[in-house]
Amino acid sequence: MQVDPNSHEGSEQAAQANSEIDKLKQPSVASKRFFGSHASRRSFLGRAGLFSAASVVAGVLGSPFSSKKGGDFVQAQYPNRRYNRAFDYNKFVDKAYRVRLEAARVERSIPIPPHPTNGDEERYPNKIGSDSRGLPHNQLGEVKLEAYNSLTKALTTQNPNDYENIILGGDRKLVNPQGPLAISLEGINAAQIAVPPPPALASAERAAEAVELYWQALLRDVPLSKLQNNTDNPKVLAAVEDLNKLSAFRGPKQNGRVTPQTLFRGSVNYVGSGSSTRYVIPPGVLDGPYLSQFLLLTIPWGTQSVSPLIRTALPGNDFLLNFQEWLAIQNGGSSGKSIKYDPKNRYISTVRDLGEYAHIGGPTYLGASLILNSNGTPLNPGNPYVRSKTQIGSNATFALGHFQALLNLGSSRVIRASYWQKYYVHRTLRPEAFGGLVYNKIANKAQYPINSEVFNSQALAQTFSTFNTYLLPQAYPEGAPTHSSYSGGAAATAAVNVTLLKAFFDENFVIPSPVVPDPNDPTKVISYSGSPLTVGGELNKLATNYAIGRGHGGIHWRSDGSAALALGEEVAISLLKDERLGYNEIFNGFTFTKFDGTRVTV
């Protein structure tokens, strides 16, 4: 017989029926972590007052049996039936208190990992390896050290007034440097998440990432349908050949070589042993079409729907090609230019289209949840209501509204973690700034330590012949956002959302009726008839599409997105762990596949 969970009986059977959290050790009043010894009486009284207030509110608002008599509130009265005992308000509130203490204890017990950098900030006194956009620069584009020091002073003292004294070079403000210092009440702390150090300025790996970015700029108006092994596109073939000559290119390969099918596909970077990096390709990312199905399907939203057709930038919308325009952006100014758009919406069908989608964004992950909820995708088998004979979930727990609330929460919390790496650890320069170093080394003979593989590449030669510049062409007139490059915030957001969606839904479900944009008319789609596409694989592809899409715009290195995907995954897992502590349902955890192919149960 199932024991009433609200029973006050002290039987052994009733004790066993209590949830795991109910068994947690009661916190000691003398605990130094949560209560100071001199404030214990005040803390106790305050907590008692909270319990009393909660009881009154619950009694008045939570039950139709509440009544008012002689000006005094009377708690809810229950019919005298066998299993209808009065709800224990204090026990419920105390359980919430103990769950929160346990969540804090668990998170506090996670060790703080090392946070190695690439050493560029210390290596170069003129800060050419560090992000300084938005601050004033000299005529070469080197930051004025007084301004850079005003930034690092604020980041060191963390005094809100010091942030207001950062010396800016123009009207453009820095993006949320204090945001990462906010303390999240759920999930892991930013300092407890490790990412590999980014490639150093002078390294062959950084050179390889730069060459890839120059090719992404050159191929912006190439259809994504040409990124397959039977391609006849000469630019695609030239890019593949050039990338295969690089000594340290870490993007996806087949049989040890870059192919048209692997070109510009995504990857994930985890912390390896020591300060090394472990490079992986998530399951499904190399399967089928380049673009995830979640970017091609109509989003059903109640009685409405959201079309997957997007506003696209016209070919030739490339910016920061002129050094003075580039310098104005570095100084926090404006290019004075804007994107010219195609008046007719269409499906994402070119490299530029995906870059523009990643520039502006849309209801990407909310949309994916709505698609999954409507196309027959089963819930994750670990969902306790999958096998319930009498109940279903709701917005409270284990149904779409609950999942969507966690998606929104995850998006905020992961940005705190990503921006902490940006501002308080790495301060890595953006690709557009690297392009300025390349330009100045060639045009002004500046002695910058750029690896020779950049200058020997066909990517740089073709950039000059196409755009008449050695700067990295940008797809956005403002260039990159005014915070540093590593790790990528948009990619981290993609990862936390995709990981949560894999926890909520059955990732092994095969997506029905997949489509691809019609290469002859990208305002339409046609059926895809290749190998099966699973929910998990297409969610992984969605995350990597978004991460690489930022590179299509010219604003992020591959490693920015690849490291951020691992970071976002870890934030999602920590949120699920905290959330689990509060459930009343019998729940054995969500099992899903991480980006590195390992199975986890949370």
Model-identified regions with their sequence ranges:
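N-terminal non-cleavable signal-anchor helices
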Residues: 4, 30, 57-61, 582
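N-terminal secretory signal peptides
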Residues: 1-40
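Hydrophobic alpha-helical bundle signature of multipass membrane enzymes
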Residues: 36, 41, 59, 65-558, ...
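Short, flexible helical or helix-coil boundary motifs
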Residues: 24, 28-31, 52, 247, ...
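N-terminal export signals
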Residues: 45-66
